[in-house]
């Protein structure tokens, strides 16, 4: 008989020398400032940022949603540490002008805080 065990997810830490964004609820690192694409997005709870890549984030199942810019297939993303829903990942854009968002991540400002080197 094979015993199934749940593997432990280890938290990623971004370098201290870079400006980073962290989960406001548990302070887990989420993204490096260098991965920020745009500050001009709207989430369900207010302003949001678009990132090229993130860390310490889990992804739910994709579903089609009509957003401000049209129909997209998106998956909710959550903090792996505290399980708070942070925003979503763009899986597929149906409009050709929105294709640049595919594979990118939205994190709402209500769920993140600036950490490290923001003097």
Swiss-Prot record:
Keyword DNA damage tagged: no
Highest taxon listed in the record's lineage: Eukaryota
Primary location: nucleus
Keyword Hydrolase found: no
Pfam family, one: Yippee-Mis18
Sample GO molecular function, one term: metal ion binding
S-S bridge residues: none
PROSITE patterns: YIPPEE
Subcellular location: Nucleus
Entry binding sites for Zn(2+): 23, 26, 79, 82
InterPro entries reported in the protein's UniProt record: Yippee (IPR034751), Yippee/Mis18/Cereblon (IPR004910), Yippee_fam (IPR039058)
Signal peptide coordinates: none
Keywords linked to the UniProt accession: Metal-binding, Nucleus, Zinc
Motif Nuclear localization signal: chain residues: 99-104
GO CC annotation: nucleus
Domain Yippee: 19-116
Function: May play a role in epithelioid conversion of fibroblasts.
Family: Belongs to the yippee family.
Name of this protein: Protein yippee-like 1
This protein's encoding gene: YPEL1
């Amino acid at each position: 008989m094979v015993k199934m065990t749940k593997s432990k997810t280890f938290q990623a830490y971004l370098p201290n020398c870079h400006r980073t964004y962290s989960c406001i609820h548990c302070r887990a690192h989420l993204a490096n400032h260098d991965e920020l694409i745009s500050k001009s997005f709207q989430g369900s709870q207010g302003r949001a940022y678009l990132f090229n890549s993130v860390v310490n984030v889990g992804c739910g199942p994709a579903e089609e949603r009509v957003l401000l810019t049209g129909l997209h297939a998106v998956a909710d993303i959550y903090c792996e540490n505290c399980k708070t829903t942070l925003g979503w990942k763009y899986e597929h854009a149906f409009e050709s002008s929105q294709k640049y968002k595919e594979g990118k991540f939205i994190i709402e400002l209500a769920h993140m805080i600036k950490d490290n080197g923001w003097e």
